[in-house]
C-alpha cells in the first residue's frame, strides 16, 4: 500500500495528515451485505417504467402485468487496485402477466466505481462504467420471445446504470459525514478533512485526513509536527473491517486546542486553611486575620504534550499554580511551577468516540515561582500541595473530555470489536463496523 499518510506537500506544512485509516476488503463485504435490503427498495422503484399521466383512479399495471417481486440474490464489492471499486449485483425478479404463470427473470449488473474529491474538498462516489444484462429464465423459444416482449415493457433497463452507486447504502451521504463538524466541548469543535481522493489497493481503501480544530467558531492554528505522519503496512491477516490511525501530533493538537480554549484553567480545592498553612509558612498569618480556606488556581503555562510509546500513552503538563484565599475576591500570595513529566493516559473507544482519561500522575515536581510570604522550600511545597495537584488535575482534565472525541466515522455505522493499540508515535484502532439499529 505504501505510505498511507505521507506528507503531501512540504511547501505547505498545513497540508499534512495527522490521522487516517483503511477500509479492508472484509469491511467492503460488510457494506455490500447490509446494502442488500436498501438495493431491493431502490430496484423496485427503478425497474418500473413511468406511470402514464391519466386521471383514472384505478391502479396502473403495465401491459396488464403485476409489479415484480425483487430479490437481491447477491451484492458484492471488490477493489480494483489504483483505480476504484467493482460493484456486482445479481437480482431475481418474478414478473406475473395476468392469467399466466409468473416468469422468473435475472438481472446482472457489473459497475466500476471511483471516488473523486471536488473543489470543496468533499468526496463523491461516481460511476466509471456500468454493464447490465437481463435474462428471462425460459427454455422454449416461443416463451422466450414472449418473455422478451414483456421484459421490454416491464423492466426499464436504461434506468439501472444512471446512478448505480445509489444501490449501496447512501454512499455519498456517508462520505460527507466523515467531514462533519464534531463537538469536543461546548465551545471547541474538530473536523476531519480529506487531503486527497482515497488510494485503492489490495489491502483496501486508504484515506489520509487532516484534523482542524475550532474554538468559538475560529480555526486554531496548531503547531506543525516536526515529523510527517505515515501509516505502516498493515497485516494481511487482519480480520477487521476498518483500521484507524491517529498520530501523536493529533493528540497533542487536541490538548493544545483545549488549552487555548481555556478548558484547563482549573480551581483546585484544598483541605488547608490560612491558619493551618501559617503553621508551616509563618508569614501567611500576617496576611489574614481570619481563618479562610486555601484555594489553588491552576493554568497551563505552556502547551501540553502527548507522548506515545510502545504499549503506553502519557501526557506532559507544565502548570502554574496560584495559591491564595478569598472568595469571590481571590488573592494569591504564592505561585508554584508544577511540572508533570508523566501522566499516564488510558485510551478506549465507545461507539465512535475515543475516550481519553488520565490514569495517574506518575512523576511531578513543584518549585517556587513567586512569593509574597518569603522563601518556601521545594520539599515543603510538595508536602503541602503535591497531593491535591496530583489528585485534582487528572480529575479536571477527565471531566473536560468526558464526552470523548469523535473519531472519523460514517454516520450510519458504529464501531464494535474495537482494539486500541498504542505504538511509538501513533495509535492504531482496528475495529468492525455495525449498522446502527435505526438503519437496519
From Swiss-Prot:
The keyword Transferase does not apply. Induction: Down-regulated by dietary stress. Significantly decreased expression between days 0 to 5 in egg whites of eggs laid by corticosterone-fed hens (at protein level). Decreased expression at day 14 in the magnum of the oviduct in the corticosterone-fed laying hens. It comes from Gallus gallus (Chicken). InterPro entries: Bactericidal_perm-incr_a/b_dom, BPI_fold-BPI/LBP, Lipid-bd_serum_glycop_C. May play a role in the developmental transition from cell proliferation to cell differentiation during neurogenesis. This is Protein TENP. Expressed in developing retina and brain, but not in heart, liver or kidney. In brain, located in a narrow strip in the boundary between the ventricular zone (consisting of proliferating cells) and the intermediate zone (consisting of postmitotic, differentiating cells). Expressed in all major regions of the developing brain, including the myelencephalon, the mesencephalon, the telencephalon and the diencephalon. In the developing retina, expression is scattered across the retinal neural epithelium. Expressed in egg white (at protein level). One of its GO terms (molecular function) is lipid binding. Keywords: Developmental protein.
Amino acid at each position: 500500500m505504501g505510505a498511507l499518510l505521507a506528507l503531501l506537500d512540504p511547501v505547505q506544512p498545513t497540508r499534512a495528515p495527522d490521522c487516517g485509516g483503511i477500509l479492508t476488503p472484509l469491511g467492503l463485504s460488510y457494506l455490500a451485505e447490509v446494502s442488500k435490503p436498501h438495493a431491493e427498495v431502490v430496484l423496485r422503484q427503478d425497474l418500473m417504467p413511468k406511470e402514464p399521466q391519466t386521471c383514472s383512479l384505478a391502479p396502473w399495471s403495465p401491459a396488464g402485468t403485476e409489479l415484480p417481486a425483487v430479490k437481491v440474490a447477491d451484492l458484492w464489492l471488490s477493489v480494483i487496485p489504483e483505480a476504484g471499486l467493482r460493484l456486482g449485483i445479481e437480482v431475481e425478479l418474478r414478473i406475473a402477466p395476468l392469467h399466466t404463470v409468473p416468469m422468473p427473470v435475472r438481472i446482472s449488473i457489473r459497475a466500476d466505481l471511483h471516488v473523486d474529491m471536488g473543489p470543496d474538498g468533499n468526496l463523491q462516489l461516481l460511476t466509471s462504467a456500468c454493464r447490465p444484462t437481463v435474462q428471462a429464465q425460459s427454455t422454449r423459444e416461443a416463451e422466450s420471445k414472449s418473455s422478451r416482449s414483456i421484459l421490454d415493457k416491464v423492466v426499464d433497463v436504461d434506468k439501472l446504470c444512471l446512478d448505480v452507486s445509489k444501490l449501496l447504502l447512501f454512499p455519498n451521504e456517508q462520505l460527507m459525514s466523515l467531514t462533519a463538524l464534531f463537538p469536543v466541548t461546548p465551545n471547541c469543535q474538530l473536523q476531519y478533512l480529506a487531503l486527497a481522493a482515497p488510494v485503492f489497493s489490495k489491502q483496501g481503501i486508504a484515506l489520509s485526513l487532516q484534523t482542524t480544530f475550532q474554538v468559538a467558531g475560529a480555526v486554531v492554528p496548531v503547531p506543525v509536527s516536526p515529523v510527517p505522519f505515515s501509516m505502516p503496512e498493515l497485516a494481511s491477516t487482519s480480520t477487521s473491517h476498518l483500521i484507524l490511525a491517529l498520530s501523536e501530533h493529533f493528540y497533542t493538537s487536541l490538548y493544545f486546542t483545549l488549552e487555548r480554549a481555556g478548558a484547563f484553567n482549573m480551581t483546585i480545592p484544598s483541605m488547608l486553611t490560612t491558619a493551618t498553612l501559617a503553621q508551616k509558612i509563618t508569614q501567611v498569618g500576617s496576611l489574614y486575620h481570619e481563618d479562610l480556606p486555601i484555594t489553588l488556581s491552576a493554568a497551563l503555562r505552556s502547551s501540553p504534550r502527548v507522548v506515545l510509546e510502545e504499549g503506553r500513552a502519557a501526557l506532559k503538563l507544565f502548570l502554574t499554580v496560584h495559591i491564595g484565599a478569598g472568595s469571590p475576591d481571590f488573592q494569591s500570595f504564592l505561585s508554584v511551577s508544577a511540572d508533570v513529566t508523566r501522566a499516564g493516559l488510558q485510551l478506549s473507544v465507545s461507539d465512535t468516540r475515543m475516550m481519553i482519561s488520565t490514569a495517574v500522575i506518575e512523576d511531578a515536581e513543584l518549585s517556587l515561582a513567586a512569593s509574597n510570604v518569603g522563601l518556601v522550600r521545594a520539599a515543603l511545597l510538595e508536602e503541602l500541595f503535591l497531593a491535591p495537584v496530583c489528585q485534582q488535575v487528572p480529575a479536571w482534565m477527565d471531566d473536560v473530555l468526558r464526552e470523548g472525541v469523535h473519531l472519523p466515522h460514517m454516520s450510519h455505522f458504529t464501531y464494535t470489536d474495537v482494539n486500541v493499540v498504542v505504538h511509538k508515535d501513533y495509535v492504531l484502532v482496528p475495529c468492525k463496523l455495525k449498522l446502527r439499529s435505526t438503519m437496519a
